[in-house]
Structures are given as C-alpha cells and as structure tokens.
C-alpha cells in the first residue's frame, strides 16, 4: 500500500476531549450542580465523571443520585438537571479551544475520508454546538445520546458500507473503546502522558497532531478482532 493512502475508509471521533478541549467545562458543570450536597459528594461526582467519559449526562445524574445521595431521581428532576447542565456548558463548549491538531486534521482530511462524530452529548445539543463552531461541513453524520456508542458505530457501518476493520473509532474514554469492541471496529485512544485508561496493546496518541502520520503508518490500530 502506498504510504500516502490511509489504512481506514472512515473515521469516527468522540467529541469532548478528542476534537474540542471541553472535558473540564463539563467537569465544572457537574461540580456546580452537586455543590449544594457538600464537598464530599462533589468529589465523588467529579471522580466518577472523569472515570466514565462518554457516558450520557442523564445516566450520570441517575447514578449520582442513587449511589451518592441514596435516592432515585425523578423524571422531572432529571429533565431539570439536564436543562441546567446545558445552560452551564453549551456556550463554553462552543468557545472551547481545539484539541491540538484537530482543526488541521479536519480541514485537511474531510474531503479525503468520510468523517463522523459519535458522542455521549445529547444529539440535538451536539448538532447545535457543531453548527455554531462551524464544523458541520466536516462530517458525514453526527450522532449522540441517548444512543450508545456501539449502536451509533453499527449505524455508521451500515450507512457507509465500510467493513469493520476499515472503520476507526478515535476516543479518550473506555466508553469509546467498549463501543468500538461491541461494533467490531478498530480503535485509537487519545490520552495525555501518564493518563492512559486503555488496555495494554491499544495504540494511543496524546492529541491529534500526529494523527495524519498514524493513518498512513504501517503500524496497525487496535482491532476488535483481537479480543476474540
């Protein structure tokens, strides 16, 4: 294969922490929402949130109330929390910096490869944010919660006609990795030095600066077939 040709026919990105530096924005929002319950609860909320990137905020709300507050969250309360969370984060995510290398990659590759987004952010909000950041034209499709990553990836496989081993999921959380394994697609982790959550053998980059080189290198990405 020519070194100028990518080893994949479609790329799927998580959003927060992979394309945009927005993880801290959402961490602060969770902390603010649970601040009335005290410092210890806030610490538990933040730790669980950071350990479960890519999980829907609504799943997190339910877990936090059940595990840390000892009660079941009502549907009305869940909707209210979701609205408050969106109000805290949406403008900040729109204004957030790019992950290093992300904008350059999207600009340089969107006409060469079909690119997709699979996020734990509610889909309507995700589409608004991507639109207001001027990113819509980069992607063939954008999908978010309430669907899980595995289901989204299977949908993208069906839409694109790309074989599983020729689709690459790029994510920064085990939720992304697990979704890739479930859908049978290849995976690349994004993790800063010293903060790699992925199993041994999974390739990792610190950001997207070297992603173009990765795509045309002979070194393979993690394949879900290796788990079987």
Label every model-predicted segment.
Residues 5-15, 19-100:
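N-terminal helical cap/lid subdomain that shapes the substrate entry/recognition surface
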Residues 7, 87-117, 123-127, 150-151:
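Short, acidic loop-to-helix structural element flanking the phosphoryl-transfer center
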């Amino acid at each position: 294969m020519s070194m100028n040709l990518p080893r994949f026919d479609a790329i799927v990105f998580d959003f927060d922490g992979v394309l945009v530096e927005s993880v801290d924005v959402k961490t602060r929002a969770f902390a603010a929402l649970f601040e009335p319950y005290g410092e210890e609860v806030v610490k538990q909320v933040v730790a669980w949130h950071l350990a479960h990137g890519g999980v829907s905020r609504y799943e997190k709300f339910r877990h936090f109330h059940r595990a840390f507050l000892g009660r079941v969250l009502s549907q009305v309360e869940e909707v209210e929390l979701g609205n408050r969370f969106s109000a805290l984060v949406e403008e900040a995510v729109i204004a957030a910096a790019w992950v290093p290398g992300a904008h350059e990659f999207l600009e340089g590759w969107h006409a060469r490869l079909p690119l997709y987004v699979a996020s734990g952010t509610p889909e309507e909000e995700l589409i608004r944010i991507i639109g207001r950041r001027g990113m819509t034209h980069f992607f063939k499709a954008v999908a978010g919660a309430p669907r899980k990553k595995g289901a989204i990836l299977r949908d993208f496989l069906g839409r694109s006609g790309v074989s599983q081993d020729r689709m690459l999921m790029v994510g920064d959380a085990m939720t992304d990795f697990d979704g890739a394994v479930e859908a049978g697609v290849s995976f690349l982790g994004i993790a800063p030095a010293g903060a790699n959550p992925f199993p041994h053998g999974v390739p990792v980059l610190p950001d997207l600066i070297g992603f173009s080189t990765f795509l045309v290198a002979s070194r393979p990405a993690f394949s879900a077939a290796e788990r079987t």
